[in-house]
Curated annotation (Swiss-Prot):
Major localisation: cytoplasm
Family: Belongs to the P-Pant transferase superfamily. AcpS family.
Job description of the protein: Transfers the 4'-phosphopantetheine moiety from coenzyme A to a Ser of acyl-carrier-protein.
Protein name: Holo-[acyl-carrier-protein] synthase
A GO BP entry: fatty acid biosynthetic process
Catalyses which reaction(s): apo-[ACP] + CoA = holo-[ACP] + adenosine 3',5'-bisphosphate + H(+)
Binding site for Mg(2+): 7, 57
Key words of the record: Cytoplasm, Fatty acid biosynthesis, Fatty acid metabolism, Lipid biosynthesis, Lipid metabolism, Magnesium, Metal-binding, Transferase
Annotated gene: acpS
Cofactor(s) the protein requires to work: Mg(2+)
Gene Ontology molecular function: any one: holo-[acyl-carrier-protein] synthase activity
Keyword Lipid biosynthesis: yes
One Pfam family it belongs to: ACPS
Length: 135
């Protein structure tokens, strides 16, 4: 079985959310994701993180779609977003890496799976699609 999730992020609105005084939104990103974002300058910083946020959301949507007709395994407010990490290889190709505890919960709900991820940016938008292949 294949399950797909997609998310679209308006980069300007996302950047405003990041810049709000007292915002804890950066906590949804892992230390590695924040480190990579800090390598970007100006608007590229928010663009980079918007793509990562879209990727995390697309994973949750693909997982949710895989259990269609069943209640959610984790309430939305209980998701530890930094446990869904977007990593890039040496050539910039991205993948989702789950924290071990979250990976175990996902496997318990859908069985063994693999994921594929794509992130794209165009103008003021970032989009991500995650495909879960469930064995």
């Amino acid at each position: 079985m294949i399950s797909i999730g997609t998310d679209l992020v308006h980069i300007s609105a996302f950047a405003e959310q990041l810049a709000q005084p007292g915002s804890s939104f950066m906590e949804v990103f892992s230390a590695g994701e924040r480190r990579k974002a800090n390598e970007r300058q100006g608007s590229r910083y928010a663009e980079h993180l918007a793509g990562r946020w879209a990727a995390k959301e697309s994973f949750i949507k693909a997982w949710s779609q895989a259990i269609y007709g069943q209640p959610p395994v984790i309430a939305e407010e209980a998701v530890v977003w930094r446990d869904i990490e977007v990593r890039a290889d040496a050539w910039g190709r991205v993948a989702i890496e789950l924290a071990p505890e979250l990976a175990a919960v996902v496997r318990e709900s859908i069985g063994e799976f693999s994921s594929s991820l794509s992130i794209s940016h165009d103008g003021d938008y970032a989009v991500a699609t995650c495909v879960l292949t469930i064995q």
